[in-house]
Amino acid sequence: MELMTVLLPLAALVSGVLFTWLLMKGRFQGEFAGLNAHLAEKAARCDFVEQAHGKTVSELAVLDGKYRHLQDENYALGNRFSAAEKQIAHLQEKEAESARLKQSYIELQEKAQGLAVENERLATQLGQERKAFADQYALERQIRQRIETDLEESRQTVRDVQNDLSDVGNRFAAAEKQIAHLQEKEAEAERLRQSHTELQEKAQGLAVENERLATQIEQERLASEEKLSLLGEARKSLSDQFQNLANTILEEKSRRFTEQNREQLHQVLNPLNERIHGFGELVKQTYDKESRERLTLENELKRLQGLNAQLHSEAKALTNALTGTQNKVQGNWGEMILETVLENSGLQKGREYVVQAASVRKEEDGGTRRLQPDVLVNLPDNKQIVIDSKVSLTAYVRYTQAADADTAARELAAHVASIRAHMKGLSLKDYTDLEGVNTLDFVFMFIPVEPAYLLALQNDAGLFQECFDKRIMLVGPSTLLATLRTVANIWRNEQQNQNALAIADEGGKLYDKFVGFVQTLESVGKGIDQAQSSFQTAFKQLAEGRGNLVGRAEKLRLLGVKAGKQLQRDLVERSNETTALSESLEYAAEDEAV
């Protein structure tokens, strides 16, 4: 029996592992290595923060222990003083010194209170330091988020600049028709390249700033730890000083008491009577106070008794509702527990799982049957997991309340039979043939009460195999939560893979766009060179060489052509110089020919 108790939970665990293997077979083998490294880095950072937090908590616990030890010493000192008072009651001749001892005790109490106030102040300061450390950690996260936001804005700016560069390419294409604006377009392209360079420098500066802030936060954390250490040492020093002061005062008072007790005996009797009378009044006041407090406690106990009765009645009503004949109430409760497990798994409702999704299944006679599983959990590659909640509480509750072994065995058999009946009913629904739903080979039958689930598996070794043969996976809250978290992890990996593909696609498009821009820019350069060559040829025809247009036009003006404007002097002089040079070269050539 003990072996079965061990093997059945192990079988449930093996079933969970088997399902996980069915889900993850052939997928994500390469991606898990990178994910595990990333998670390890995150876990290392979390461990570092948790270690720092644990160290601070342990130091606070040590300080609290020292403070309690100080209170115990104070209490022990009070006990010693009480013993001294009893001794004074038996020795009237020592009453005078008793008064001084009481005065000393009062002073010690005042000092103890002062130390307690100081300890509270130190504890408050420690709490503030701890809060400051938490605020610094939160500030670090905010700074990192802000830096990531700035980097994303920088990337967006770079993309905008790249789009602007593409526009520049179009402008250069239009520049072939507008040669007069070529130089302005080239300056604009240079300005955009400088802007791109400045953005890259800004991104590098943000990265350096991030490293500086991380270093600053680490330094502040070390400073906080040093402050905590100094506060602990100060508290220990104060505790030692208080103990030494108490011992010194007690020794001094004891010595003075031995020297002066006989001389002041006659001054003690009257104050002693007054103190005894005051003590009686104090006892009376204490008794009255205890009576009032006892009455208050009695009223509070009556109120608690009423609340207990109310809770008992409400618990009984809930038990009756869940174990009665109202199966709808049990079903609603089971669905509520199932949805709670889904919310804690990390899956998002409406996207990664759907509640009460209606579907249709075709029957063998050609008709259709409408089915509505409790939950459909979506998987990558358009697959789904069907989860149906089944509540078996009536027999289980009677089993827990059984007064003898025979009744317990009978109710246990009824409990297992109830689960088996739910399993057979679920297998008849055959959720695997639903239209529009690509389910796995298994349907999850969820039992919301973990002890009831484990009790059935422990006492019926064939129940799990019988469910498995009918393609039903019997799960409780713990096993279902582990499976759903595995599904959530699969979705995260799928999202990362989709993001990686999108990044690769965008990178390819960006590279193609960059190649096109380079080709366009080369064409623009060739056009600029060609335009420059054409410009030089046209300018030579205009103002250089023999018979140029400027020289001919200037001759017409000199011959008396009326004109309201004149050509620029330097252009005319250049035309004359080139004309004279051309003529001299022609004469030289003729002389050589002669």
UniProtKB/Swiss-Prot annotation:
Signal peptide: none
Coiled-coil ranges (or none): 66-330
Keyword terms: Coiled coil, DNA recombination
Pfam families per record: RmuC (PF02646)
GO biological process, one term: DNA recombination
InterPro entries for this protein: DNA_recombination_RmuC (IPR003798)
PANTHER family cross-referenced by the UniProt entry: DNA RECOMBINATION PROTEIN RMUC
Family classification: Belongs to the RmuC family.
Role: Involved in DNA recombination.
Protein name stated in the entry: DNA recombination protein RmuC homolog
Lineage: Bacteria, Pseudomonadati, Pseudomonadota, Betaproteobacteria, Neisseriales
Gene that produces this protein: rmuC
